[in-house]
């Protein structure tokens, strides 16, 4: 009987990528298959996030819920990975002694060895070291599930923003060699992947050796140019980028590489220079706006999303008003916005915070309502337009229909004959948008002359 692994993921897209790799590692080493039901699992893993306190506490809440599964099935293994694991280490086992494995983002490739050691010794295994890029040398080839895929190009962060735990939980920035990244992307393209998203905590800080041991370094712009030349790759995305690392070379790539999408996630975090300085972000609002102005001169249709923190210690009404002014000026399509959550061990955790939580919540609600208005307005502006989408698979709303994604990351659902589904999935096609909803669109297939038989038979 095939053994199964259940993985619950908290937090960022890097964690989503790491969770997929956990499954790949355990499948290659022990033949485990992924399950969406913890009750069916032989191994349960939590890939955790420590960016906000709520996510961190949710992990321990979930651990409490699976404890009874362990009591009913003593051979069940429970593991905690990700940033909470890096931060808490063995204290997780002290707090939840039924946990068998504790591993950091850089040691997930050691899971099979940790499992063997746990079974042989009967003791919980903890490995939260930072072996730099070793992880990627031990990961099996990715198993493709659709025409889009994520490729991690670097690990860690060296920015040390005053509020952020990532440098402490994932380590400093370490870039994969260029040839390793290109080999992975080419392998994905050979399996039918048409769109890749390049991942990193500060992805545009990429500085990878041309090959392992080489003294010659490729920057992020060079990497994008090489990825664009790989046969089969038709779209390139990346996340998350940092305003401080937006070089002229990267701006030039937007003019030279049409496969790089008209969508950018560029966290600003705040609209007040005073708060940005307290956050140690390393740029001013004017410098941030300058990057966007230059980009939109090259790509007038650029869609922009961001991250914003509300209620950072010392934030005044005037500071928040500056954030709102920036939101209106930038016309953000999406914002991941949250109330500031002090993280132990970070410099900002020691700052005095006398803003009432009710006021922070009111500010957050105002910000999110404004962003939602932007989302609706941008969606409405797409009505009647023909959009190029990558067909990803059956629609979640109606499996008899198909769904794809536009360059600005909108999901488009559209009807298509069932017989045509296998041919259309993984293809770049044109759809005309005829309905706009808050977070998705509906369209109809646009057929070029001579394409009708291919789509209807």
Swiss-Prot record:
It holds the Pfam family Radical_SAM. Residues 3-120 form the MTTase N-terminal domain. Its EC number is 2.8.4.3. Residues 380-447 form the TRAM domain. One of its GO terms (molecular function) is 4 iron, 4 sulfur cluster binding. It catalyses: N(6)-dimethylallyladenosine(37) in tRNA + (sulfur carrier)-SH + AH2 + 2 S-adenosyl-L-methionine = 2-methylsulfanyl-N(6)-dimethylallyladenosine(37) in tRNA + (sulfur carrier)-H + 5'-deoxyadenosine + L-methionine + A + S-adenosyl-L-homocysteine + 2 H(+). SMART domains: Elp3 (SM00729). It is an enzyme of class 2 (transferase). One of its GO terms (cellular component) is cytosol. It is found in: Cytoplasm. PROSITE patterns: MTTASE_N, MTTASE_RADICAL, RADICAL_SAM, TRAM. [4Fe-4S] cluster 1 binds at residues 12, 49, 83. Its cofactor is [4Fe-4S] cluster. [4Fe-4S] cluster 2 binds at residues 157, 161, 164. Catalyzes the methylthiolation of N6-(dimethylallyl)adenosine (i(6)A), leading to the formation of 2-methylthio-N6-(dimethylallyl)adenosine (ms(2)i(6)A) at position 37 in tRNAs that read codons beginning with uridine. HAMAP family: tRNA_metthiotr_MiaB. Belongs to the methylthiotransferase family. MiaB subfamily. This is tRNA-2-methylthio-N(6)-dimethylallyladenosine synthase. It comes from Burkholderia mallei (strain ATCC 23344). The gene is miaB.
